[in-house]
Regions:
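Exposed boundary/loop context
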Residues: 7-10, 62, 115, 121
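Long hydrophobic alpha-helices with heptad-repeat/coiled-coil character
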Residues: 14, 46, 50-52, 127-132
């Protein structure tokens, strides 16, 4: 068990840790996306200024084409046109065309949510973006400034927090 804790800590530092210490970013948070588990985890800084304290976990849906790597957010959009002639709310650009955004809507209208797509949260289902519930993606939109570090990876790492189940 001690070995498991040690491995977890080493992986955590590799995901958000010392490479992005307090002096290198002004963001209060670092975000990781486990594309295998379909979980977004938000970390805040510890006393030493490293992002090691998990504070939130969200169920998400990534895609088979979602890139792995470390990125910094670069733009935000209350509504954003998405691939496939649909819309997403509270989008935050991760890199290139890849965004955090809500489950898609048929129109730029809160009453047109694609319920079938909502029910896919927790599975690999997007064209590459990271889909999250409106409540959770709005938290990122409101609390994580442009320049926030995002680390996306695939692996069987046990996440430190488990997201609340998404009601179907």
């Amino acid at each position: 068990r001690s070995l498991g804790i040690l491995v977890f800590c080493l992986l955590l530092f590799g995901l958000c840790g010392t490479a992005f210490a307090a002096e290198k970013t002004k963001s209060p948070y670092c975000i990781t996306v486990n594309l295998t588990a379909n979980v977004v985890t938000v970390y805040e800084k510890d006393a030493a200024g490293n992002y090691t304290v998990p504070i939130k976990a969200f169920r998400c849906s990534g895609g088979t084409d979602t890139p792995e790597g470390t990125f910094r957010t670069s733009a935000k959009y209350e509504w954003r046109a998405l691939y496939g002639n649909v819309w997403g709310q509270y989008a935050t650009r991760i890199t290139g065309p890849y965004l955090f955004h809500s489950v898609p809507y048929f129109e730029k209208d809160k009453t047109t949510l694609e319920y079938d797509e909502f029910n896919k949260l927790g599975t690999t289902a997007s064209a590459g973006c990271i889909r999250i519930t409106v409540r959770d993606v709005k938290w990122i939109y409101d609390n994580c400034p442009i320049g926030t570090t995002v680390r996306m990876y695939r692996g069987d790492v046990k996440e430190p927090l488990q997201p609340v189940a998404v009601p179907k």
